[in-house]
């Protein structure tokens, strides 16, 4: 049975759903394969030495020590991590995401949260776009399956812009810098970290 240790953000809440294993699969009997998305700094990412680090990684390590199990972390990306869990190719997943009613209704369980997240939009530093009204007729970028995508979708019809979807954040930011899209949406802490650490010419 799959353990799902997914970190989830929404309206000031970051929480961890855990799907319990069957009695036959004691946590201490095996090394669990945990999938993740390591381009979501500061929650999960790789350092200069290629090690998996971040808030979610620290939480997973603490859970493993408390519950007495070993694990192997695999960076698969968000969609692939979910698919691996569903197919039994991974025992669980830990990654930054957002709480939605749809996820609750599908059976995700949530603990108390620890992070307050909001959504932000960024553009090139020399862009004439100052607000949502300036997006009319233009195209923005979002990462597939994120709250940033949901937020942009909620504004799309009102402000008359188009949306292009990307599988990871770095590609999305490069699309803004390269002019393929005029702006992008993402969780504020992820965006701030990406712009600062990558020294990106975005604002």
Task: State where each predicted segment sits.
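Short, low-complexity disordered leader/linker segments with a strong preference
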Residues: 1-31
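Extracytoplasmic small-molecule ligand-binding "clamshell" domains
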Residues: 24-97
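Beta->alpha turn/N-cap motifs
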Residues: 36-40, 74-79, 88-101, 125, ...
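Ligand-binding cleft/hinge of the Venus flytrap
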Residues: 44-48, 60-69, 148-167, 195-199
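Short helix-initiation/N-cap motifs at beta->coil->alpha
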Residues: 57-58, 73-84, 127, 163-180
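A ligand-binding cleft/hinge motif common to bilobed small-molecule-binding domains
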Residues: 80-83, 96-105, 151-154, 177-203
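Short Pro/Gly-enriched coil loops immediately N-terminal to beta-strands
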Residues: 108-120, 169
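Flexible hinge/capping segments at coil-to-helix
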Residues: 123-140
């Amino acid at each position: 049975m799959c353990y799902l240790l997914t970190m989830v953000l929404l309206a000031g809440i970051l929480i961890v759903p855990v799907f319990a294993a069957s009695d036959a699969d004691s946590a201490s009997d095996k090394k669990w394969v945990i999938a993740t998305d390591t381009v979501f700094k500061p929650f999960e990412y790789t350092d200069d030495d290629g090690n998996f680090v971040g808030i979610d990684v620290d939480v997973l390590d603490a859970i493993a020590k408390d519950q007495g199990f070993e694990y192997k972390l695999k960076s698969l990306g968000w969609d692939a991590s979910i698919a691996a869990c569903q197919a039994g190719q991974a025992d669980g997943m830990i990654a930054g995401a957002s709480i939605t009613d749809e996820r609750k209704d599908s059976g995700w369980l949530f603990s108390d949260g620890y992070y307050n997240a909001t959504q932000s939009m960024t553009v090139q530093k020399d862009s004439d776009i100052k607000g949502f009204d300036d997006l009319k007729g233009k195209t923005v970028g979002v990462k597939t399956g994120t709250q940033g995508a949901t937020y942009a979708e909620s504004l799309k019809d009102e402000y008359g812009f188009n949306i292009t979807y990307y599988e990871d954040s770095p590609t999305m930011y490069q699309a803004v810098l390269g002019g393929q899209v005029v702006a992008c949406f993402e969780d504020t802490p992820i965006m701030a970290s990406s712009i600062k650490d990558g020294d990106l010419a975005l604002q």
